[in-house]
A protein has these predicted regions:
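C-terminal-of-GTPase-core extension/linker across diverse P-loop GTPases
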Residues: 1-220
């Protein structure tokens, strides 16, 4: 099930506070532990699609009342925006709360469709699609984004590409963990890392922060 020991221990400690020794647990106690472990180790984010239909708001409120992570989504609007952006009709970056029309020579039906999408986006602060991905990565899975670079001054790789890669790692990951994700040999011959912003030298056990830009220095 890919559940780490620290997670199991943490859930055990939380559940067992008022239950005494594990050997004395009954079936109800075991079920409560199993449920808590599942919720902690396999979090669920609900992308509540079709949030624009009339019954959606009440359904979303009802699910949110259970404490679950629920993101209202309008996937059809996201698809329309991406297609329009690909054709140069609008400027839109996934996750933005609105968009800008570039081509004003649109048919009336196209204008109405875009205006309808704009109104929905104002209500939900976007289409909810990118927000669902963000909530899954950063809230449910507690991931961080780290940028490895070869040139700490130019923030680039050896070919001059600025911030060429982005790695999503678990919170608590170290500089050496990043090296392993880039290449196993970097981790094997790891010497130290450099924070590209502060130019500070970092050890193997340095705990990475979200949006760190890191250069790995190895013996090879």
């Amino acid at each position: 099930l890919s559940i780490s020991e620290p997670v199991i221990v943490n859930v055990l400690q939380e559940v067992s506070k008022d239950k005494g020794r594990y050997s004395q647990w009954d079936e109800k106690d075991i079920f409560e532990f199993a449920r808590a472990l599942r919720l902690r180790s396999k979090p669920i984010v609900i992308a509540a699609n079709k949030a624009d239909i009339s019954t959606a708001k009440e359904n979303i409120r009802r699910i949110q009342a259970t404490g679950r992570i629920v993101i209202p989504c309008i996937a059809e609007a996201e698809l329309l925006l991406k297609r329009a952006a690909a054709k140069g009709v609008i400027e839109y970056i996934p996750g933005d709360p609105t968009f800008k029309v570039k081509d004003h020579a649109l048919r009336e039906e196209q204008k109405r469709a875009l205006e309808r999408v704009r109104i929905l986006m104002q209500e939900y602060n976007g289409t909810g699609v990118q927000q669902s991905i963000d909530a899954t990565c950063f809230n449910a899975l507690n991931l961080i984004v780290v940028y490895p670079v070869e040139d700490a001054d130019r923030l680039s790789d050896k070919d001059g590409n600025v911030l060429p890669d982005a790695f999503m790692l678990k919170q608590g990951s170290t500089a050496k963990d990043l090296a392993m994700h880039v290449h196993s040999e970097l981790a094997e011959h790891f010497l130290y890392a450099i924070d590209a912003r502060s130019k500070q030298r970092l050890g193997a056990e340095y705990r990475l922060k979200d949006r760190d830009v890191i250069k790995i220095v190895s013996a090879r």
